[in-house]
Structures are given as C-alpha cells and as structure tokens.
C-alpha cells in the first residue's frame, strides 16, 4: 500500500531475476521491492512476460497497475502483455532507460 507520507510504494516483482531487481532498486530508490505476495496488495507490479503468462498476472492483480517487459525481440510476448491489459508494455532495455518515469507515472495514478 502506498505510504503517501514517506512516498514509498510496494512494488511486486514477478518473474524478475536478481540482476533486473538490483538495477530497478538503483534506478528507483525509496520504494520497497518484493518478490513474493505479501499481506498487503502491491501498489505496482513489474512482470517479466518471458517468464510468466501475462493473463495470469493480470488476473491476479486486476486493480493494480502492471508494467510488463521482455527482450525487444520478443514481440509476441509484448503483444500478449498488451492484450492482457497491462498498463505499460516495454522492452527490457527501455525499462532501464525510462523505468523511473514510467513507475512514477503509474504510481501517481494510484494515489
């Protein structure tokens, strides 16, 4: 749940490897990154669609903004995430370039 006093959000990482997690933590400091479901619902989900079924992720978190990413060559995965209703679908390289602005924009929509 977004802690508006501290500006800290809980971001659930689904299917995300350790390298991606550490890059995201460095790019977007001040938020709590989780890799498993906690008691509280997350404020945002970031999912690697190469490792997970986008429909399953969207079904589990219908009221939470979702960012899906995969390699830029996985156009089928990007299309599946878009069709599943993800709020943002992005290539992995673009996630690291534009991630902070995308995350901030989606978190602002839940405040």
Role assignments for model-derived ranges:
Residues 1-10, 102-111:
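Non-catalytic signal-transmission and effector/linker regions of two-component phosphorelay proteins
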Residues 9-17:
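Conserved acidic segment of CheY-like receiver
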Residues 18-34:
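Two-component/phosphorelay signaling modules centered on CheY-like receiver
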Residues 33-41:
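Short acidic low-complexity segments
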Residues 36, 85-100:
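Output/docking surface of receiver
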Residues 42-61:
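Conserved phosphotransfer microenvironments
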Residues 64-73:
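A short, hydrophobic beta-strand element within the central beta-sheet of small alpha/beta folds
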Residues 73-87:
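Alpha4 helix (beta4-alpha4-beta5 surface) of REC/receiver domains from two-component response regulators
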